[in-house]
């Protein structure tokens, strides 16, 4: 029977997504304008929850299309304006530049990264030690680099491991071309090894992702909102680290202890071992690479290593915006390694650009949150508290809202409100500094609960490796749960019991100094 035009359009709509999913998105699109006319505040929250739903269903359909449709409608009916959406993108231009250039830059360093991490994986046969080293390494790197950059590195490494084994399991040689997205050529006896390897890589990906949160909270370059908070408070790199340390140091060790416990007791889907057959294949690949490595190949690895050193120095020294350093890496890596045709360069951008577009849609949703005042009641309520209870409430409120929204937005909204309170004389400068610590730790730590809380987690969820490892939204939430509980509680306890006393001790030791009452023109105007 010939399909009608409407039927054909419906079939094309969102492609291979399940029928119930298509109908849900259509229902949202019909329902939202009606709800907006009745109650804009509730309609705003409905849009936020619908957007989270599209993220949760990322393995069914990439969130850019359904999320983008919902946002376009929101713009048309007046929930926010294109001008405000553009403003949010401009405010976060460093994150956009980072995604466009830094992730592509990492692509051109993947040979060196795979070489290093293969050595680590094959040398460290103890899974607990390997997991703890992944958490510690990603935490250390995230303290100096951006968390998104570190996750891009981990994804590149994971993809490398996965494609090597998948190629051999499908009956191909190491040097053969292969589509690692299809399991059709994997023999049934090897399927279980493949599933075990997926579980093993899922473990490492989640440990590394949490590591970025543990390290990212410590320094002003670790997360984008840290830069905003440091700018408002006029803190430099060293002062930011010292002021955060009463909370971040106990949390870091609690995070490492959690990794040990999860791997030791094999709970929350952790404890998956690297199958021996996979280890043998990775070892054979490593030996083959070493046997066939030419002087030219060795030179490429050395050059990528030197570029990696420039990456760390450039970011730690704040020589330029993260994205611009990423652009320098693209130029250096491609020119020194002889990659000069447009097609080869274009491949590097395939991974990050869909996510960049999705993040811009997300900034549109943030504009709706601001214009409809969705978080205002929570902010006003938290500002009614005083003393230690206010610190705790700021920490919890930031954490709760960061699980729903983006922690960059939540952190910047709260620090702006607190800066305004200081300008109007409602709080002292010392209280402002303490609240800034509570805001920073609150946005960074509990937000590991959901992929929409941390941009690095969202990047992992929507990356090419997530469907290969069967890493869904629900899986990420479940595997992050023990970390969420431990990091939130330890951070909360450190904020309530230790932050005030330890900050006073830091003043007494002259490791930090009291600031003047005013924030300066930039903070006040912001």
Curated annotation (Swiss-Prot):
It catalyses: 2 Na(+)(in) + 3 H(+)(out) = 2 Na(+)(out) + 3 H(+)(in). It comes from the Bacteria. It is found in: Cell inner membrane. The keyword Cell membrane applies. GO terms for cellular component: plasma membrane. The chain crosses the membrane at residues 25-45, 52-72, 89-109, 139-159, 204-224, 240-260, 305-325, 355-375, 391-411, 448-468, 479-499. Its main location: membrane. It is a multi-pass membrane protein. The keyword Ion transport applies. GO terms for molecular function: sodium:proton antiporter activity. Keywords: Antiport, Cell inner membrane, Cell membrane, Ion transport, Membrane, Sodium, Sodium transport, Transmembrane, Transmembrane helix, Transport. It holds the Pfam family NhaB. Belongs to the NhaB Na(+)/H(+) (TC 2.A.34) antiporter family. Na(+)/H(+) antiporter that extrudes sodium in exchange for external protons. This is Na(+)/H(+) antiporter NhaB.
